[in-house]
């Protein structure tokens, strides 16, 4: 409101900053830097162990500005000014950048990028699990151009595998882990054109249960795509938009349940069932007909948080002595940005960071490689010379020198937040900019905000995490993970690599022992 804004202006002019007294002393910063340097020097001893477990946290749309803003929000939620806060991903020792473009797009979409960081090859926008030789919507270009994912490589190596997402389980990001489709929007056969069905292309929901039939953990939304058309939803009976969509009449959930009886598999559709079930060997949890709600709108009694899903997933997957691969997507960061709802997006990012922290408590860097990255960025940013501790959702402490009006610190390059009132820019000082659904100001009017094209950060820790350095193509990521775990096409080096996975030291010892024994004889 106007009073709050006036107070900000006054405090700014008084050169007020909510820093502590110790920050005025150079010793504070020197001590902090020396401590950081000491920690950095320990990284000279590289972790060359074999990665028994692999975890990929994917923040959909979580560009670097989103990471920074989420860091500030996390601190402010804990009563701090925010800038000095550390996200869990900030603690990872190795950081690199990934170039996100698709083969046919400078600014990418989530399907082509998912194919890159899961399957190891760049692809066209809108396609999943196929090479760039496949053309979007053209079914006849798919056959023979399928590519497999690291989830498949891990499964073939005897590891347990899982997918956890806050979107539909057949959405762009998770689908690239198991599906091959020339259109990311073919969620069920209801969304597919007749000629594609005739040519033998399969919908993505069907592929979830058929292509890799023994995925150990499946959690997210997308329930309606698994049931016959017009079948009433178990949670929202009688609500047409939540009813089943499948034209083929198949009940994929029932088929999965029948197939998993011998494995004692559990199908769950609400939080209570998830939390209180005994830890099964296999689980499929579909908690909403479509995407899960934003964390700020989530009913904590019925829908699990991303952190809760990750905890259950790891409890199940770690029972396999050969290890596991887990894909975790904070998928609704992207949705919040598209809608211009920065508060929704940033709270989603903070929740994903909580999930990263929970996974860290349940695993060890000795044998678990964890990577945190994004598929792409957004045209989201914040600025305006805000003072230290300024609420991340607040106003900049200055008026525009063009129209003499306030503006929000958070700004989108385009999107639905572009608003005119009587032909002039909206006076945001009279608007409740802190409500959850507030659409932050945008420079160009669009019904949906767009992706950004800049590089995204890749945070890594665990065995061979140092291989993620510098600037790389996005498709490099699964190759590093596979190399660390000795799966897929990266196996030969495992016989000679030093560390717990390397067998050369062991073989050398055996040869030496045999030589000594022969001499003694």
Please place each PLM-identified region on the residue numbering.
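Cleavable N-terminal signal peptides of Sec/SRP-targeted secreted and luminal proteins
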Residues: 1-15, 507-520
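Substrate-binding/charge-relay-adjacent region of secreted/lumenal peptidase catalytic domains
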Residues: 104, 108, 119-128
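A post-motif C-terminal structural segment
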Residues: 21-37, 47-52, 62-68, 72-115, ...
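Outer membrane beta-barrel
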Residues: 161-170
């Amino acid at each position: 409101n106007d009073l709050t804004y006036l107070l900000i202006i006054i405090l700014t002019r008084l050169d007020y900053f909510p820093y502590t007294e110790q920050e005025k002393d150079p010793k504070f910063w020197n001590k902090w830097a020396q401590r950081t340097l000491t920690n950095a020097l320990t990284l000279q001893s590289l972790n060359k162990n074999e990665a028994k477990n692999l975890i990929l946290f994917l923040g959909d749309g979580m560009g670097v500005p989103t990471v920074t803003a989420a860091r500030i929000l996390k601190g402010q939620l804990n009563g701090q000014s925010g800038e000095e806060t550390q996200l869990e991903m900030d603690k990872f020792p190795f950081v690199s950048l990934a170039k996100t473009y698709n083969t046919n797009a400078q600014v990418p979409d989530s399907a082509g990028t998912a194919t890159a960081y899961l399957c190891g090859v760049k692809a066209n926008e809108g396609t999943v699990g196929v090479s760039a030789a496949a053309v979007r919507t053209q079914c006849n270009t798919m056959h023979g151009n399928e590519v497999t994912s690291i989830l498949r490589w891990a499964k073939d190596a005897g590891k347990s595998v899982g997918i956890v997402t806050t979107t539909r389980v057949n959405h762009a990001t998770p689908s690239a882990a198991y599906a091959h489709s020339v259109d990311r929007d073919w969620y069920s056969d209801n969304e597919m054109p007749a000629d594609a069905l005739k040519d033998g292309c399969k919908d993505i929901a069907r592929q979830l249960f058929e292509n890799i039939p023994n995925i150990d953990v499946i959690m997210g939304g997308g329930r309606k795509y698994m049931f016959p058309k017009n079948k009433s939803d178990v949670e929202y009976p009688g609500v047409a938009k939540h009813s089943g969509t499948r034209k083929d009449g198949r009940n994929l959930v029932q088929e999965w349940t029948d197939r998993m009886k011998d494995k004692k598999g559990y199908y769950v559709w609400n939080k209570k069932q998830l939390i209180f079930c005994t830890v099964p060997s296999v689980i499929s949890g579909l908690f909403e007909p479509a995407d899960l709600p934003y964390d700020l709108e989530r009913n904590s009694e019925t829908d699990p948080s991303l952190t809760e899903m990750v905890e259950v997933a790891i409890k199940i997957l770690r029972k396999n002595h050969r290890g596991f691969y887990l894909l975790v997507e904070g998928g609704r960061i992207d949705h919040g940005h598209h809608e211009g709802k920065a508060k929704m997006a940033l709270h989603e990012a903070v929740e994903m960071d909580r999930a990263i922290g929970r996974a860290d408590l349940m695993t060890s860097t000795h044998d678990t490689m964890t990577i945190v990255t994004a598929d792409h960025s957004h045209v989201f940013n914040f600025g305006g010379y805000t003072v230290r501790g300024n609420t991340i959702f607040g106003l900049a402490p200055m008026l525009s020198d063009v129209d003499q009006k306030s503006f929000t610190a958070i700004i989108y390059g385009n999107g639905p937040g572009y608003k005119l009132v009587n032909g002039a820019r909206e006076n945001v000082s009279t608007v409740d900019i802190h409500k959850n659904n507030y659409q932050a100001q945008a420079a160009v009017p669009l019904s949906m905000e767009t992706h950004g094209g800049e590089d995204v950060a890749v945070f890594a820790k665990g065995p061979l995490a140092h291989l993620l350095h510098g600037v790389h193509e996005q498709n490099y990521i699964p190759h590093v993970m596979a190399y660390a775990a000795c799966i897929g096409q990266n196996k030969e080096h495992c016989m000679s690599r030093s560390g717990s996975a390397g067998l050369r030291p062991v073989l050398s010892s055996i040869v030496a022992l045999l030589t000594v024994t022969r001499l003694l004889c």
